Amino acid sequence: MVGAIWSMPPKDVMDYPIISLFNFFNNHKLLHSKNDRPKWLTVSNGSIQYVSKIIRFLDANPRVKTYKNINITEIKRKNNSITVKDSNNNENQFDHIIFATNPTKILEIVKDTDEKEKNILSSFSTNKNTAYLHNDKSLMPSLREVWSSWNVHIPKKKVDYISVTYWMNRLQNINNSKPLFLSLNPSKLPKEKSIFKIIDYEHPIFDLGSIDSKKQLPKIQGHRNTWYCGAWSGNGFHEDGINSSVELAKKFGIKILWE
């Protein structure tokens, strides 16, 4: 279950702190009786809905300039000025920078991390996972009656990955007349003609080192005009990404529209 929830390989599951695990299970009432469990809600048609809405909101603001699909290759900081260089060798200067990506990516592009930053950020690691969007029903349980939103497959032979198939019709309120599934690290590949898209992901790995470094993160927030947010700074979910960005916005004195 731990591997399925956090998309972690079996070899890393045993490094997940047991106290953090029990707290998570308790907060989500995963161990409660069926009648005491919360009714979970999802965003119809997926997270792209709120991502697109945020982009439209920013694009409509004349004070905001957005750059999309640009590969950042290097970031340097000097005298409270931050230089951002992209793959086309364009450089732009900024007063502050906010990283909304995982620490492994940050360490790749920031060339001047000091010892304090490096010690905290290097404690975080990620696991690569491949997802297949498809309509091959053979990757779902053979009994239609037991189809669930999340379907974990445990192969008979020992493997170093977790295989989960998500029933997208149920998760994102998609018409059942056209079956749609997302299989993460499938133990067998979907039929070639059934595949719509292949997506590579990197999910955070949570162990004692990263849990401790999350507590240390406030020590480098704002250090050298550099800030951090993202799901990795919480429990790895979309809500954690939003919560961390809201808390960061408050530090800049930004009014939260729904508060």
What are the roles of these predicted feature ranges?
Residues 1-73:
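Active-site/ligand-binding neighborhood in enzyme catalytic cores
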Residues 4-10, 106-108, 192, 236-238:
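Short catalytic/ligand-binding loop motif for oxyanion handling, primarily in non-cytosolic enzymes
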Residues 45-52, 104, 243-246:
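A structural signal for well-ordered alpha-helical segments within the folded catalytic domains
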Residues 57, 112, 251, 255:
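Active-site catalytic microenvironments for nucleophilic, acid-base chemistry
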Residues 66-68, 99, 228:
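A structural signal for the hydrophobic beta-strands that form the central parallel beta-sheet
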Residues 69-71, 87, 229:
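Conserved beta-strand termini and adjacent loop/short-helix elements that scaffold enzyme active sites
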Residues 73-202:
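Mid-domain catalytic core of redox enzymes
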Residues 159-259:
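Conserved flavin/dinucleotide-binding core of flavoenzymes
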